[in-house]
Design a protein with these regions (language model features):
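A structural motif detector for short, solvent-exposed N-terminal "entry" segments of globular domains
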Residues: 1, 63-120, 177-184, 198-208
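Short, surface-exposed alpha-helix to beta-strand junction/turn motifs within ectodomains of secreted
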Residues: 2-27, 113-115
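Solvent-exposed beta-edge/loop recognition patches
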Residues: 30-32, 36-46, 130, 135-227
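Contiguous beta-strand segments of beta-sheet-rich domains
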Residues: 46-54
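Short, solvent-exposed loop/turn segments at the edges of extracellular beta-sandwich modules
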Residues: 55-62
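Short alpha-helix capping/helix-loop boundary micro-motifs
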Residues: 122-129
Length: 227
């Protein structure tokens, strides 16, 4: 159930709200300043939903409402960082692209979980799509795809479905176009859901550099990791 609270009494009819994706039906009812909306079927974990509707006050004045949220994941998987590959190369004999590898410590669903990584100038983000994973599975998030058809997200039983550079037949491959890892100094953090503190993370820098961080992008992630 989704609840919206206003600063004065409002009225709605049951069909006052609709959703995208349209497969989810929204039934609304009001009680004083609150509007309760039931969604059927429930959004899958991490599914992006846009809720749109209209409410009226006792004088007939209407207000348009639009809310975007993700389906709640009550069984987030527990994943930890196990390998980071930066400094992609285009070698014909041994090419490599940027990726982050995770190991699943506790099975669950990846939907709604996300990864952030930062350079000195930019913060990038990948939202995992709904996918059931088991303990000890390997997940590889590729951050510099070539954009070829063989690069496929592996959400089903076939973990050898995807091709592409650095794809693995033994783990689940996911592909992000948000941007690659910085070669020298960067930070990575992993989250169960929006608004939560990171459950794991990693900071790296050039051995020749020392002193305090000067990038606000890197500092924001490193501070969360230290909390």
């Amino acid at each position: 159930e989704f609840e919206i609270e206003f600063d004065e009494p409002v009225c709605v009819c049951r069909e006052a709200f609709s959703t995208e994706p349209k497969r989810i039906a929204a039934c609304a009812e009001s009680s004083g300043e609150k509007v309760s909306i039931t969604l059927l079927p429930q959004p899958v974990p991490g599914e992006k939903v846009i809720l749109v509707g209209t409410v009226e006050d006792v004088y007939g004045n209407s207000t348009h409402v639009q809310v975007q949220f993700k389906g709640y994941n009550d069984r987030p998987a527990r994943i930890i960082l196990t390998e980071v590959q930066a400094a992609k190369n285009t070698s014909k004999k041994s090419p490599h692209r940027d990726y982050i590898e995770f190991t699943v410590q506790k099975g669950g669903n990846l939907g709604g979980m996300f990864v952030q990584w930062a350079s000195s100038t930019k913060i990038m983000k990948y939202d995992f799509i709904p996918c059931e994973v088991k303990a000890e599975e390997i997940i590889v998030l590729h951050l510099a795809p070539e954009g070829i058809l063989e690069e496929k997200d592996e959400t089903g039983e076939d973990t050898a479905l995807s091709g592409g550079i650095d794809a693995t037949a033994k783990g689940r491959d996911f592909w992000s176009e948000a941007g690659g890892l910085p070669d020298s100094s960067g930070a990575i953090s992993v989250y169960e859901r929006e608004g939560s503190l990171p459950i794991d993370g990693f900071f790296y820098g050039e051995g020749s550099k020392s002193g305090s961080l000067e990038s606000s992008k890197l500092i924001s992630i490193v501070q969360e990791l230290s909390d």
